[in-house]
């Protein structure tokens, strides 16, 4: 976060949870609510929304020595996007931009259906995020392998803020969505890239498709939910996991993907 900030890339105000005086200065300067986030972990695991200073200090004292593994961040209401990329010798050779239906933090705290859907590269938000993602990767000196980055578009001013990045493939079946819409299996390509590098060979990305797609995942009331009723021809993948429901829809028609995502999200909520 500090490296990205020093590169002039916009991001929410933050403070490491180490020095108590610095934390107090942050809480006096940045109005609540805040977000207390693990510096490790994946997705929205372990993230706490903090309403006021009393609640913050309760969490910090409760964490004890583990508090230093957290970062305190300004809460920015907005729409959250993710950028999944593959970088070779410092050059981003593959990038895919998607937008979450609801921010993962909201889904993990309040429940509901987790959804995300791809954006075409011609979309203005995608264009802005491809550029911003490249700036983040360059600032961090990442030269080799996959990245999964998240950004938020502020409701207040419509500007993008960098949230976080990890040098790994995205979780929560995001890699399955990327594979279904582009033909690029990020896990397999990461392995191929490592093998080519170890052998001193040149890595070549496979042909990339540019389809539209959406992913839906949620907890299920049934032990093994019946997914056969979700039978649109655009459904290309279904989750087979106890107490879970999930699927991916893919089409050349962006509006068809959005209509199916909305319809199936409503049905997931009822079923």
Question: What is the meaning of each model-derived region?
Answer:
Residues 188-271:
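Peripheral (often C-terminal) accessory segments that flank ATP-dependent C-N-forming ligase machineries
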Residues 54, 74-80, 84-142, 146, ...:
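ATP-dependent carboxylate/phosphate-activation module, predominantly the ATP-grasp catalytic core
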Residues 10-12, 33-36, 47-82, 97, ...:
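Conserved ATP-binding module of the ATP-grasp superfamily
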């Amino acid at each position: 976060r500090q490296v990205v900030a020093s590169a002039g890339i916009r991001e929410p105000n933050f403070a490491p949870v180490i020095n108590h005086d610095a934390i107090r200065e942050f809480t006096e300067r940045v109005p609540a609510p805040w977000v207390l986030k693990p510096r490790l972990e994946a997705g929205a695991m372990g993230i706490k929304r903090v309403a006021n200073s009393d609640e913050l200090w309760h969490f910090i004292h409760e964490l004890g020595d583990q508090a230093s593994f957290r970062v305190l961040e300004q809460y920015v209401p907005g729409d959250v996007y993710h950028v999944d990329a593959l970088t070779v010798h410092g050059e981003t050779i593959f990038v895919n931009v998607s937008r979450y239906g609801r921010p993962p933090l909201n889904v993990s705290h309040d429940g509901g259906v987790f959804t995300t859907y791809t954006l075409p590269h011609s979309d203005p938000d995608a264009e802005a995020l491809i550029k911003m993602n490249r700036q983040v990767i360059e600032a961090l000196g990442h030269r080799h392998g996959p990245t999964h980055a998240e950004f938020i578009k502020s409701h207040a001013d419509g500007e993008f803020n960098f949230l976080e990045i990890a040098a790994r493939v995205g979780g929560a079946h995001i890699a399955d969505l990327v594979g279904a819409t582009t033909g690029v299996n990020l896990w397999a390509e990461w392995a191929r890239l490592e093998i080519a590098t170890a052998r001193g060979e040149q890595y070549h990305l496979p042909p990339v498709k540019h389809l539209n797609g959406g992913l839906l995942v949620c907890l299920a009331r049934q032990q093994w939910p019946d997914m056969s009723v979700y039978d649109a021809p655009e459904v290309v993948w279904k989750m087979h996991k106890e107490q879970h429901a999930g699927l991916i829809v893919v089409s050349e028609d962006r509006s068809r993907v959005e209509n199916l995502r909305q319809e199936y999200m409503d049905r997931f909520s009822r079923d």
